[in-house]
Amino acid sequence: INMPENHDTDFNWPDFVERVNAELIAAYGNFVHRVLTLGNRLPESTPLHSFEDLSYCTEEITKLESLHVQITSSLERHRFKEALRFSMNAAQLGNQMLQNATPWTYLNDLTQDGSKESMAKLSFGWRLCRYLAITMQPFLPFSSEKLWKMLGENGCLLYTSDAADDVLC
């Protein structure tokens, strides 16, 4: 992440392209795409939120709460590179969670052993996408607003109060 916080920085296009591809698309974009695509593949009679069971996601919630404290602290200290890095860590956490849960293996038969935990993780992935829309808003305002709408949220993301705290509960 190249930002002039404490000193000048050198900008070059190859580094910019590599960072966009390696960080934004590979971590953030991939995670959001996976959650939205897998959620869309569910039967219409079974919405994603019906699988929510946070008891399966305590480890992820703990990690996300820690990242939230770090993101908030970084933003309060005007350490934007650091805050962005922690936000990207939340996207990586989501990717790892989905990779381990393999919810795509249960989409055709939601009664299989292990499907309840796996689908609970996918449902938590939706919460995490909502959290990413909120925390990435200072860095990607237009994309965050688009994601906010794709998640079915009403109103303008910028004027949503305490939205990040709501995601963690």
Model-assigned labels for residue ranges:
Residues 159-169:
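Single conserved hydrophobic/aromatic residue that forms the stacking wall/gate
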Residues 2, 67-69, 130-132:
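Short hydrophobic "helix-edge" motifs at membrane interfaces and signal-peptide entry regions
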Residues 11-24, 66-85:
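Extended, non-catalytic structural segments that build the interaction scaffolds
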Residues 1, 8-12, 85-86, 140-142, ...:
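Short coil/turn segments at secondary-structure boundaries
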Residues 73, 77-79, 88-161:
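Basic, alpha-helical terminal appendages of large translation-related enzymes
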Residues 1-53, 154-158:
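Catalytic adenosine-cofactor/nucleotide-binding cores of aminoacyl-tRNA synthetases and other
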Residues 20, 24-27, 31, 56, ...:
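Amphipathic alpha-helix face/heptad-repeat signature
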Residues 32-71, 91, 95-115:
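Conserved, charged catalytic cores of large soluble enzymes
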